């Protein structure tokens, strides 16, 4: 089962600073990333491109996904390293209403494939200036794999919809 943990985090403070400094909503995303990269010692990168060739994945449900060109691509907003874990963060205005686990987990799959870093060493998180949510990537993996087994080895509709939107 996936347990989403709502917690306090400096990312919310940095988002508040960005909101105060930038009037244009379209530039706030960039401002949050820039402020965190320059001022947060845990943040190691922003806008990290990730990709994976679906047919070469060792994860069975990813192999079964359909795409226009056999690849999935995306950009991780913020990458952090803290407490011996790699954090994949997504700045989402209105974070409390968002449900980005599919997106974040696909990013984790891509990152794991390209770096060899196991899900057990990754956390997925999304935040805005008021809320910060995180989950263990391994919990998401276990839940997805269990669902995959139960559904007779079919990719969930939600995951397939996400994949089709990103390709």
Label every model-predicted segment.
Residues 73-76, 80-143:
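Nucleic-acid nuclease catalytic cores
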Residues 35-83:
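Active-site metal-binding core of divalent-cation-utilizing nuclease and nuclease-like domains
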Residues 1-48:
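A non-catalytic, helix-rich entry segment at domain boundaries
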Residues 12-19, 65, 90-95:
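Surface-exposed cleft-lining segments at the edges of enzyme active sites
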Residues 22-27, 67-68, 102-105:
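A short linear-motif detector with a strong N-terminal bias
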Residues 163-167:
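Accessory terminal regions of nucleic-acid processing enzymes
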Residues 104, 144-147, 152-156, 160-161:
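Catalytic core segments in nucleotide and nucleic-acid processing enzymes
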């Amino acid at each position: 089962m996936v347990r989403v943990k709502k917690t306090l985090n400096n990312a919310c403070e940095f988002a508040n600073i960005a909101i105060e400094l930038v009037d244009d909503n379209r530039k706030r995303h960039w401002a949050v990333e820039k402020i965190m990269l320059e001022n947060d010692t845990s943040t190691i990168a922003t806008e990290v491109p990730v990709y994976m060739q679906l047919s070469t994945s060792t994860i069975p449900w990813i192999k079964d996904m359909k795409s226009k060109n056999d690849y999935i691509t995306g950009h991780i907003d913020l990458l952090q390293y803290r407490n011996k874990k790699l954090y994949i963060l997504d700045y989402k205005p209105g974070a409390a209403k968002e449900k980005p686990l599919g997106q974040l987990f696909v990013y984790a799959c891509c990152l794991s494939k390209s770096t060899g870093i196991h899900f057990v060493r990754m956390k997925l998180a999304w935040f805005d200036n008021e809320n910060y949510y995180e989950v263990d990537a391994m919990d998401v993996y276990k839940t997805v794999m269990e669902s995959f087994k139960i559904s007779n080895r079919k990719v969930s509709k939600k995951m397939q919809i996400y994949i089709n939107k990103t390709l």
